Regions:
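Replication-associated primase and helicase/ATPase modules
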Residues: 1-34, 43, 48-49, 106, ...
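Intein modules and their embedded homing endonuclease domains
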Residues: 2-127, 259, 372, 392
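P-loop NTPase catalytic core of nucleic-acid-dependent motor ATPases
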Residues: 30-57, 98-99, 104-218, 287-289, ...
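Short beta-strand segments
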Residues: 172-175, 221-222, 265-268
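Conserved nucleotide-sensing/catalytic segment adjacent to the nucleotide-binding pocket
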Residues: 210-253
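Loop/turn-to-beta-strand initiation segments
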Residues: 216-219, 260-264
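Phosphate-handling catalytic cores of nucleic-acid transaction enzymes
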Residues: 309-351
Length: 456
């Protein structure tokens, strides 16, 4: 009969001289460390564990005194057991405070030093209320953006400091290239650390797994947004407006409910357009800032980003001021007339129905008049042809006009009488002026209706 090895009195309680008891190891480890496992991730007083290599290193330091085989596999097994031992059902975000390198700052301005508690996220910047003003940063913004648009950026960056989507806005900063707008992203890395990630709005719109990559993230930056219109917008809209948990899915795994509070920021040479979504909601959620023209002969400083990063404590105070202003305004962003005009221009560029309804010489908005949907679309096609524009499909056109009923005092119904005397779908409130292919007139190509007497 084989005798069991005598116990080593100096050995840890979880090691019997031959084997490691993972459960006992985890109990001892968790008694000496503040760590929990929730919502698919480990959290410590430093925030979410984004790389488990340091944690594996700590476990290795404790195991190396024990002569056991295949330590890497043992460490992996211990981490899996630790997920069970440290598991808590949920770890809700705290939107009323910002955890910083040297303490916690609440939105009311009160600050508590130290980092005793486990937190969801901790920014790598320290709170120094007497930090000098970020002179280089402010000078950079003054050269990049119009003065009245800088408060909007200030509020949006402040908005990204807390895990909340109450503002329900994303931001697009648009320029012709070379202005230096992407330097903002480099500074935000210093401000947010691992709580920010690079991404692609196009990928988010197309890939149902991309949303899960933004779980626990405060900000996703698309440094060079591609110009193609989005085929789908529902994923992007759901992220911008998410309040609480949403359904997330990772490849090969069952979908689950996860916290989503990522904000979206894109730098681009063009607009964020939708291929099929003509709804007001998609464009209403965009804050579109345009940059100033790059001055001729300007010499760019290759070290500007590093110099601005050195001002990160002052930049944090500047952003926190914007956040407090946003909260005081019930999460309604400050918008200049230029910003509002930018959004309207993006909306109209993607949907020429608005320009058509406001055009002259084709239709007239008149309360006691009616027009069938078919006739209205034919006039719209003629307007597009004469203005060298691409017409929408019939269904998209009708949906756009229906969505604009309130704005233009229209009523969509099936009580319209067409030229043949039949009841069809159409609109109250529109009178036809131009009449292509209406009332029997047609020709080889579509053109404006010409009276018979003009053809004699």
């Amino acid at each position: 009969m084989t005798k069991r090895k005598s116990a080593n009195l100096d050995a840890p309680i979880w090691f019997d001289g031959t084997n490691i008891n993972e459960a006992l190891f985890c109990d001892e480890f968790l008694n000496s460390r503040k760590i929990i496992f929730a919502n698919g991730a480990f959290f410590t007083p430093d925030g979410r564990v984004t790389d488990d290599l340091p944690l594996r290193g700590e476990i290795y330091e404790k195991l190396k005194c024990c002569a056991v085989n295949n330590i890497p596999r043992k460490i992996t097994n211990i981490l899996e057991v630790m997920k069970l031992a440290a598991h808590v059902e949920d770890f809700a975000p705290e939107a009323d405070r910002i955890h910083l390198a040297n303490g916690t700052l609440k939105l009311d301005g009160s600050f508590t030093e130290g980092r005793p508690n486990i937190v969801r996220s901790r920014l790598p910047v320290a709170y120094r209320p007497d930090a000098p003003a970020p002179v280089r940063w402010l000078s950079f913004l003054d050269g990049l953006l119009y003065t009245e648009d800088i408060p909007t950026l200030q509020e949006f960056i402040g908005y990204c400091l807390i895990p909340s989507n109450k503002g329900q806005r994303m931001m697009v900063i648009k320029g012709n290239g070379g202005e230096g707008k992407s330097q903002i992203g480099a500074v935000l890395v210093a401000l947010l650390g691992s709580n920010m990630k690079d991404g692609s709005i196009g990928k988010i719109s197309e890939n149902r797994f991309a949303r899960a990559d933004l779980e626990h993230i405060l900000l996703c930056v698309d440094d060079d947004m591609r110009m193609e219109a989005l085929r789908q917008t529902n994923y992007v809209k759901s992220i911008v407006t998410a309040q609480g948990k949403m359904d997330l899915e990772r490849k090969g795994k069952q979908s689950y409910q996860g916290w989503m509070f990522a904000r979206l920021l894109a730098f681009s040479n063009g607009d964020l357009q939708a291929l099929y979504d003509r709804s007001d909601g998609f464009y209403r959620r965009q804050l579109v800032l345009t940059t100033k023209e790059k001055p001729a002969g300007r010499i760019d400083d290759p070290d500007l980003a590093e110099k601005m990063k050195a001002e990160v404590e002052g930049i944090f105070l500047w952003a926190f001021e914007g956040l407090q202003r946003l909260v005081a305004n019930n999460f309604k962003f400050t918008e200049s007339q230029r910003t509002r005009d930018n959004r309207e221009a993006v909306k109209r560029d993607s949907n020429n129905v608005f320009d058509f309804l406001e055009s002259e010489g084709y239709i007239r908005l008149k309360a006691d008049c009616t027009i069938s949907s078919k006739d209205l679309y034919e006039i719209y096609r003629m307007w597009c042809e004469e203005n060298n524009l691409t017409p929408l499909k019939r269904r998209s056109f009708s949906e756009s006009v229906i969505a604009s009923q309130t704005k233009y005092n229209l009523e969509y119904c099936n009580k319209i009488t067409n030229a043949a005397g039949r009841r069809v779908w159409g609109f109250f409130g529109i009178e036809a002026i131009a009449k292509p292919n209406i009332n029997g007139f047609s020709d080889v190509s579509e053109r404006t209706y010409v009276p018979d007497r003009w053809q004699e």
